[in-house]
């Protein structure tokens, strides 16, 4: 655990599919909170002292493992991965998805169960598909920014 995480002053980004990295950077600059961008391989990111990049490698769940190991009380994790969110909540982190929804200890069990049911349904459709997610919108981006500000205020 680093000094950053001991102080509860760290934002961890599950970076491979995160559409709100720029919003996170902007907010981090304003609050002077370090950001650790974690991904399987290199992602472009600002050259700024608050931003660090961790390349976790291609092993299955390598990036998730790096994030879960750094998760601690007071850290903020941004991920769309429900199973990673569950691990981070267990470690005491505040966890948001990229649309600004908060994963909580009260809701994560139902979200994990729903994920499992949907995976079973998709597997049973044998390539027919059930549609994907709606495109990421400006409203989603705004909702995330508002939720991020609220979450960071709770970390102080």
From Swiss-Prot:
Pfam families named among the record's database cross-references: DUF188
Protein family per UniProt: Belongs to the UPF0178 family.
PANTHER family for the chain: UPF0178 PROTEIN YAII
Designated name of the protein: UPF0178 protein Jann_2168
Organism listed in the record: Jannaschia sp. (strain CCS1)
């Amino acid at each position: 655990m680093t000094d950053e995480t001991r102080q509860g002053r760290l934002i961890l980004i599950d970076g491979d599919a995160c559409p709100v990295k720029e919003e996170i950077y902007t907010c981090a600059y304003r609050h002077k909170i370090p950001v650790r961008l974690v991904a399987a391989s290199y992602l472009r990111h600002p050259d700024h002292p608050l931003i660090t990049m961790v390349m976790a490698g291609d092993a299955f769940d390598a990036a998730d493992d790096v994030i879960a190991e750094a998760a601690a009380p007071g850290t903020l994790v941004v991920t769309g991965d429900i199973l990673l969110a569950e691990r981070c909540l267990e470690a005491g982190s505040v966890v948001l998805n990229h649309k600004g929804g908060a994963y909580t200890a009260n809701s994560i069990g139902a979200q994990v169960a729903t994920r499992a049911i949907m995976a079973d349904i998709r597997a049973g459709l044998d390539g027919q598909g059930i549609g994907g997610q709606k495109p990421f919108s400006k409203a989603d981006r705004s909702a995330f920014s508002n939720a991020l500000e609220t979450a960071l205020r709770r970390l102080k």
